From Swiss-Prot:
GO terms for cellular component: carboxysome; membrane. It catalyses: a UDP-3-O-[(3R)-3-hydroxyacyl]-alpha-D-glucosamine + a (3R)-hydroxyacyl-[ACP] = a UDP-2-N,3-O-bis[(3R)-3-hydroxyacyl]-alpha-D-glucosamine + holo-[ACP] + H(+). The active site is at residue 239. Catalyzes the N-acylation of UDP-3-O-acylglucosamine using 3-hydroxyacyl-ACP as the acyl donor. Is involved in the biosynthesis of lipid A, a phosphorylated glycolipid that anchors the lipopolysaccharide to the outer membrane of the cell. Pfam families: Hexapep, LpxD. It comes from Thermosynechococcus vestitus (strain NIES-2133 / IAM M-273 / BP-1). This is UDP-3-O-acylglucosamine N-acyltransferase. GO terms for biological process: lipid A biosynthetic process. Belongs to the transferase hexapeptide repeat family. LpxD subfamily.
Amino acid sequence: MRLADVAERFGATLDCPEHGDRPVLGVAPLETATATDISFLANPKYTALLQTTQAAAVFVRPDFQGEAACPLLRVPHPYLAFAKCIEWFYPQPKPVAKIHPTAILGADVVLGAEVTIGAYTVIGDRVRIGDRTVIDSHCTLYDDVVIGSDCRIYSHCALRERVQLGDRVILQNSVVLGSDGFGYVPLPDGRHYKIPQVGTVVIGNDVEIGAGTTIDRATLGETTVANGTKIDNLTMVAHNCTIGENAILCAQVGLAGSTHIGNHVVLAGQVGAAGHLTIGDRTVVSAKSGISSSVPPDSRMGGIPAMDQTLYLKVSAAVKQLPDLLKRVRKLEAKVGE
């Protein structure tokens, strides 16, 4: 592969066409790239690395003006170009469509074309699986599960009764969809009476769910995740939550029951949301924040309890001054007491 081929494939402008015959064998970060690797610059904080990188060339924005030790490939979206370059150089192996002899299929299962089912996977009755979907080993699909086309379900996932997946859904290892919601009636004698959880979970198209994440079935109706949303590892979504389109939930987010997340919302790592509230479209919440009330669209929030991000930064700065302020207050109290 030549550098000129990379430029042509990704519609990039090569700053130094005379280097077009330079060989390209892979992709790598700026700091570890070798003379045959393509790299990228998307975050300005790493601009200085352009002067020391050994990369064959680097994807940058068209308006980039800095110095570089290698040729530059100018594209509108360097990070996206880099991602597609990875796909090009490291294509994913296509599984051989087959049903492993140790897999167990229930009655009236409907399989689409080129479906793959791995070893020791158990498929319940009346399950429907779309074309080209791959289900790895040791997965369990309970009765009446519906899975769309081109999905990838990695090992040890469990999909409970009536769970539905759209097309091109990715479930990383040990995802659990449709476990019972956490619902109990407190009794006068202190015991807790379990409320039957008879709803389900519905996942839209192009959703990816990270390893160890759990999404509980609705008490009645549906817990839903809309098209294009990405959920990181070890996230908890409780019963009757709804998550809009193209949202991002980072690792260890926890949503209590009946939390409603809008479209294009970003919840950073370990954000927690109390139940029965709404987080409006395009809202961004910083890491470890606690959301205790509904948030309007286009908000920027942080802190516990979550507040406007600008106020949160001021409060955080003020907290660092508290020890000195406390000393000053004590001195003033001592003077007043004299």
